[in-house]
Design a protein with these regions (language model features):
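Flexible loop/turn connectors
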Residues: 5, 259-367
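Short beta-strand segments enriched in small/hydrophobic residues
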Residues: 42, 47-52, 86-102, 202, ...
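Short acidic/polar active-site loop segments enriched in Thr and Asp
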Residues: 46, 149, 208-210, 271
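Short acidic capping loops at alpha-helix termini that bridge into adjacent secondary structure
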Residues: 209-210, 241-244, 294-301
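N-terminal helix-turn-helix DNA-binding module of bacterial transcription factors
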Residues: 2-90, 366
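Alpha-helical recognition/docking segments in bacterial nutrient-uptake
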Residues: 2-31, 89-201, 205, 261-267, ...
Length: 367
């Protein structure tokens, strides 16, 4: 960005009528920024002592640390993180590479991760693939080139080659939310197969015999496992495989984009709907009501993610999930442990899920 040589910064020059030296914008910015030397002069300590106090060096007395830190705050001191990184070998920066920021589930996780990382004096950098798998390698390269201390990675459709790239680079990382076969790496995810099973078991126990399953993206491990668990529950309940009509994830997303959900919710050859995620279930509920159908009196619906827990303004929806705070807390802990000890054996954490029953399922209507 170019700066005008005559740009004004309030308080940088003398009052009207006073003679002042003319400075460029860059010079003004340099003049304004407080340095360690400025703090040292104000406190009467050496630059080295000031630096140690701002790092929280407990070999200095608490009174000395407090005085220097308060002086730095009053002078609006901004630390030079790049210089600190060069000295310590740590950037205190964690990159999170996520598939889609439109997905509220991801946003809730990012919010909790940021909070947990800040508690450990780390900053979070968000890099998004925007549903473009080919961007993953570029974003991983960007994160590594910026010397992040670690990566929290939401793999999309497996992406073993990108995971191998991170392994070869030596950067600590944790995989989240997806199962990636034949990869030895720290992983934190929900038990999606169990989640699908719970959905099928719950609906079958209510007496449902005909189902509509609205899928996620075809190659997603979550989609594969949830549908597998759902079908297993129906088989265990004595129901045939053809009692489920499965709508592919690509068709679901297309219907959402073009407001054509009626194309697969009608004709109604089902009494219960299973949605891959809540953000699909909500517009489906609206479409059902637009066609004069009541939930759960006419149609039961169950989904995954439990977004209502994070945003109570959302409608009630029976949903399956493990708590977001558990996923965020565990993934951050595993990554920080990996940063401290790169030789730890890989940990694979699979969190149990449960049904959050919020009144959108009931026995099917009588014929």
């Amino acid at each position: 960005m170019a700066f005008r040589s005559d740009c004004a910064i309030i308080g940088a020059c003398g009052s009207k009528g006073q003679k002042s030296e003319r400075m460029t914008g860059m010079e003004q910015m340099r003049r304004v920024r407080t340095t360690l030397k400025d703090i040292a002069n104000a406190c009467g300590y050496s630059v080295n002592t000031v630096s140690r106090a701002l790092r929280g060096d407990k070999r200095l007395s608490k009174a000395t640390r407090s005085l220097i830190q308060e002086t730095a705050r009053s002078m609006d001191y901004i630390p030079n993180t790049m210089a600190s990184s060069l000295r310590s070998g740590r950037s205190r920066m964690i990159a999170v590479i996520v598939n889609d920021l439109h997905n509220q589930h991801f946003c809730d996780l990012l919010n909790r991760m940021d909070r947990d990382l800040r508690d450990q004096n780390y900053n979070l950098m968000i890099l998004c693939m925007h549903l473009e798998e080919t961007l993953a390698g570029e974003l991983i390269h960007t994160a590594i080139s910026l010397s992040v201390d670690g990566i929290l990675y939401f793999p999309n459709f497996g992406q073993r080659h990108y995971i191998e790239y991170m392994t070869d680079s030596g950067v600590p990382f944790v995989l989240l939310d997806r199962r990636v076969n034949e990869v030895d790496a720290d992983t934190v995810r929900c038990d999606d197969e169990q989640g699908g099973y719970l959905a099928g078991q719950h609906l079958a126990a209510l007496g449902h015999r005909r189902f509509l399953f609205l899928s996620g993206m075809e190659l997603s491990s979550s989609q594969i496992d949830r549908l597998s668990g759902f079908r297993r529950a129906l088989r265990d309940s004595g129901l045939p495989d053809d009692c489920v009509r499965v709508v592919p994830g690509a068709d679901v997303e297309d219907a959402l984009a073009h407001n054509t959900l009626a194309s697969f919710i009608l004709p109604r050859d089902y009494t219960a709907i299973v949605s891959f995620r809540d953000e699909v279930a909500y517009p489906v509920m609206n479409a059902l009501r637009d066609h004069g159908l009541s939930i759960p009196q006419d149609v039961s619906i169950i989904s995954f993610d439990n977004l209502h827990a994070e945003d109570p303004s959302r409608p009630f929806l029976t949903s399956i999930y493990a708590a977001d705070e558990n996923i965020a807390e565990i993934s951050v802990r595993l990554l920080l442990e990996r940063i401290e000890d790169p030789m730890l054996p890989p940990r694979n954490i699979v969190l149990p899920v449960r049904i959050f029953d919020q009144g959108t399922t009931a026995p099917p209507p009588r014929a």
